[in-house]
Amino acid sequence: MNERGMLVDPRFDAFFKLEQIDDYKYDGADTSPSTSNGLPETSNGGRLICDVCGDVAFGKHYGINACNGCKGFFRRSVWSRRQYSCRFGGDCPVVKEHRNVCRSCRLKKCFEVGMNPDSVQNERDRNAKNGGMGGPMSSPTQSSLCKELTISNGQIKRKRLRPETVEKTTQTDGKLEINDDFDFENMQQNPTPPGLLPLKIERISTPPSDLPVPMDFSIHSAVLDIEQKVFYNCPVAVDNSINATKTPITLPFEVVFRQPHLVCNRYPMRFSNTRVLTPEDLIDGWRRHFTYYSDWCHAMDEFKALSPEDQIVLAKKKIILHGWLVHAYYSYKSGCNGICFANGAAHLPEGGHPSITEFYKECMPRYLNYVIYPMHNFQMDDAEMVLIKCIMFFSSESGLSAAGRQIVSAAREKYLSALYNYGRANKCTTSAQATLRIAKFMIMLSAITSLTHLMNEGVHVTSLFNIIEFDELIQATHKTTPPQHSPPAPMG
């Protein structure tokens, strides 16, 4: 039995010997960047857990139990004096599955749990003395300097002090003190003090200019204003649209999308349960939504920035998704446990028109359970609805030109960030809750996608057997996704 009073497997002997050695101390702080190659277990058999991200830790690094990933991240950040910024309010969760998502919050967590930046510099100085292993090469003068790093107003500041006893080969003064409190904003005017290595300044995760910064809450107001203007764009005061329902529309989508008044007048929309939905009401409600959808698309700046060809591809692909979302939301707002249309007709789970009941037979259970119920559960409001609608509309880039894909991708990121910011400010107390809320909304959108496929099949079958006489425009719109653009063949 060894001096610990227990038997030690020879394979782990090096591990226990390493643990017996006192860590290198600097001003009383634990500075050992442990590289223990034994098992990551405590003396009582439990596994060491990284204090930063919760991953498995293999010993103490810079004063805390840390995994190799967080150890390396902290070392690189301190050595290079990197400065990060957070897009999401500065309190992102730091867990092992997503620890690389926000470097700003990860570095902040490193300091909060007690990682010692002095330990990083001591390791660097020792490596420099031993030939530069583990860090950039330094001169004897530079390696004899010690650093003290502090955090002030979100900036990393560094101070180097030269000890009174210096090597004879480099001594020119009795004592030398160097201060280099850098102002990152005015660094160009402040030259690097003598004896210091050039510093690498790196700003990471700064949102581009076309994306909202964390405190920009104007985006949801802008799209909400568009929604209200389009919704209440009602030059026709009297609802006489039912009289024209039986007139078939044979014009192609590309034509009527630019001239939606050819499909339906812009009569006032009232999503309510005033009468039982009939096949005529269904067709009329579909047409009123078509006009509303066209007006909304043409009011969006990102949509107007697309080429005419990309506009048609995107509009045709998203019209049914848009229809399910807005009909569900305005039905939820009206308190109807079913689906309401703009003409005041509604279909409920029970007691509907036989043809309509057959048409919605497959859709209604999913619609109520995975769309209407989540809206009630989340207490979704108008701002969230319009932002989710934008995310859904700009969620796909297939079939678009290269320029169109770039516009759609930027728009999606813009509205996704805006939805997070709105939820973080108005619905949730932590960033984790806001992220979870968005994830649940995305699940709801996947249910709407499923409903779209079911309805496309329903329109096809219903038209085939003449259960409901849909015109050519409706049938064409509910067919498969429009053809996608193929990249041009290489010349030669």
Curated annotation (Swiss-Prot):
GO terms for biological process: regulation of DNA-templated transcription. Residues 47-122 bind DNA. It is found in: Nucleus. A zinc finger (NR C4-type) spans 50-70, 86-110. The keyword Iron does not apply. It comes from the Eukaryota. Keywords: DNA-binding, Metal-binding, Nucleus, Receptor, Transcription, Transcription regulation, Zinc, Zinc-finger. One of its GO terms (cellular component) is nucleus. The keyword Metal-binding applies. Residues 121-143 are annotated as: Disordered. Its main location: nucleus. Residues 215-481 form the NR LBD domain. One of its GO terms (molecular function) is DNA-binding transcription factor activity. Orphan nuclear receptor. Belongs to the nuclear hormone receptor family. This is Nuclear hormone receptor family member nhr-4. It comes from Caenorhabditis elegans. The gene is nhr-4.
